[in-house]
A protein has these predicted regions:
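Conserved "HGTGT" condensation-loop signature of ketosynthase/thiolase-family condensing enzymes
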Residues: 1-132
């Protein structure tokens, strides 16, 4: 997961500080969420706003990357990012990052990252730039 995010940053010729929001894969599985939060913290530190959209749309299997990309781009255009639904309490084993929970958040970001992590290490991290 960490490697996928770092390679995406390298391909985009960006530093972690350039990213204003991360759309987490966030499947609400103990092992997956702990691993993803740790990898995200290692790349971005504790101040990166992050949420998962699966609580809004479910896990659409092969379609989740495309749907979450579209939703992330839409949220960026609106300068408002949705919270992770039903995230009332963060697992203490998850890393301390800026989870968007309870209510959405107004954010004006230039770059955002969408992550999808699958069984067997089939991982993608895509970076998008907000259109003018």
């Amino acid at each position: 997961m960490k490697k996928a995010m770092l390679l995406a940053l390298e391909d985009a010729n960006l530093t972690p500080e350039a990213i204003g929001y991360v759309n987490a894969h966030g499947t609400a599985t103990e092992v997956g969420d702990i691993a993803e939060s740790e990898a995200t913290w290692l790349v971005f530190g504790e101040h990166i706003p992050i949420s998962s959209l699966k609580g809004h749309i479910g896990h659409t299997m092969g379609g989740c990357g495309a749907l979450e990309t579209w939703m992330t781009l839409h949220m960026a255009r609106e300068n408002w990012f949705a919270p992770t639904l039903n995230l009332n309490e963060v697992d203490p084993l998850c890393s301390s990052i800026d989870y968007i929970k309870d209510e959405g958040r107004q954010l004006d970001v230039e770059y955002m990252m969408c992550n999808n992590f699958a069984f067997g290490g089939v991982n993608t991290s895509l970076i998008f730039k907000k259109s003018g």
